[in-house]
């Protein structure tokens, strides 16, 4: 949580104790095709007609006294290294632009029959960011501690960047909070992959050698997807060409905060170990690119990035691990930090380990791939 949010948070608490509410700013009705600017408030963006229609995930809290409501995108972004609100605006504007080009951005990944049996599945979806040409695809899983899905900062901006590298990108909104029990997010990722593969022609994608990318809890999600017992094999899906993890949760034993959300209220030790990625890597695990920051105050790199490196090295999995001295948690693209450019390195790693003729020619970075 950045300083600006903290200030607003404590201000809102004082107002609550006084029986008052933070005033929501007045917004004129926005034209349907209007683009977002960094000076727009979160509250006004939530009401944008196109973003409402495409069910964009802006921010999970939108009540009248919400501390986020009065912040501009620039203010919201100010707590994350040198990221500016323009990065977030670009992600949202890509949705608006695609919608204007008659692209159906929002995609329901479960059938009506599946949703009828389990209504929580209606809350899992994809947002589609097409490449200009037929290409390989990647599914981006934002973080949020399995309590939220932070697509605004860790989803849409990544999709735009990946489009620029020549890939078709999808941003997954998976089930969170109590709906995440029984590893529902992993099921959602599997359903998303199946949806894309089943609609390959319509979506103009190459079905082979796809990638999955995740941040923080989303990193844990994509990491689990690569495991033999609970991942892609369980759902009879093809093996991903590459897994990409940014400041990811790896050891659930060392960070039990999320366990009750994805396993249930009283998970036993055996269940926790089963979703600890470092404890379940096998020689058939997909090639993996991952990075961590020594200045990450939420997920200690020694318990997560370093432990994953030990596991993949032991199993001779092709991998690339970057450990940044000053990188913090939640910096997404890493703009203005030593981590900036990591997405391009990850794409180069993906291309290097691909046997697909549609691989994008991205400049390759040095890596620590097992021989």
Give residue ranges: language-model regions:
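C-terminal catalytic histidine-bearing segment of alpha/beta-hydrolase fold enzymes
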Residues: 2-38, 42, 306-309, 313-371
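N-terminal cap/lid segment of alpha/beta-hydrolase-fold proteins
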Residues: 60-62, 67-133
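Short beta-strand element of the alpha/beta-hydrolase
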Residues: 135-143
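Short beta-strand/loop motif that positions the catalytic acidic residue
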Residues: 284, 289-296
């Amino acid at each position: 949580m950045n300083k600006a949010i903290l200030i607003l948070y404590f201000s809102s608490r004082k107002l609550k104790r006084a029986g008052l509410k933070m005033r929501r700013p007045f917004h004129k009705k926005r034209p349907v095709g209007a683009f977002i600017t960094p000076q727009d408030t979160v509250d006004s963006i939530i009401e944008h007609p196109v973003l409402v229609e495409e069910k964009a995930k802006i921010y999970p809290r939108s009540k009248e006294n919400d501390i986020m409501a009065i912040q501009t995108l620039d203010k919201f972004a100010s707590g994350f290294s040198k990221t500016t609100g323009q990065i977030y605006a670009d992600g949202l504007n890509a949705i608006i632009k695609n919608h204007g080009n008659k692209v159906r951005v929002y995609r329901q990944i479960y059938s009506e029959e599946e949703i009828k049996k389990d209504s929580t599945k209606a809350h899992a979806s994809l947002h589609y960011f097409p490449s200009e040409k037929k290409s390989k695809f990647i599914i981006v899983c934002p973080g949020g501690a399995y309590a939220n899905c932070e697509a605004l900062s860790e989803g849409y901006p990544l999709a735009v960047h990946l489009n620029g590298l020549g890939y078709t990108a999808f941003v997954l909104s998976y089930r969170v909070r109590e709906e995440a029990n029984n590893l529902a997010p992993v099921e959602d990722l599997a359903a998303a992959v199946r949806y894309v593969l089943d609609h390959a022609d319509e979506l103009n994608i190459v079905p082979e050698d796809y990638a999955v990318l995740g941040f923080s809890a989303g990193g844990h999600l994509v990491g689990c997807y690569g495991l033999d017992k609970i991942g892609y094999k369980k759902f009879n899906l093809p093996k991903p060409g590459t897994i990409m993890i940014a400041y990811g949760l790896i050891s659930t034993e060392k960070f039990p905060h999320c366990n009750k959300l994805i396993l249930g209220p009283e998970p036993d030790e055996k269940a926790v170990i089963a979703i600890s990625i470092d404890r379940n890597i096998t020689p058939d695990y997909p090639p993996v690119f991952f990075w961590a920051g020594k200045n990450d105050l939420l997920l200690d790199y020694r318990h997560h990035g370093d432990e994953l490196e030990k596991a993949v090295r032991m199993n001779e999995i092709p991998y690339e691990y970057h450990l940044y001295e000053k990188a913090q948690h939640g910096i997404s693209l890493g703009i203005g930090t030593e981590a900036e450019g990591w997405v391009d390195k990850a794409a180069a790693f993906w291309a290097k380990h691909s046997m697909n003729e549609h691989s994008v020619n991205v400049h390759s970075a040095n890596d620590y791939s097992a021989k």
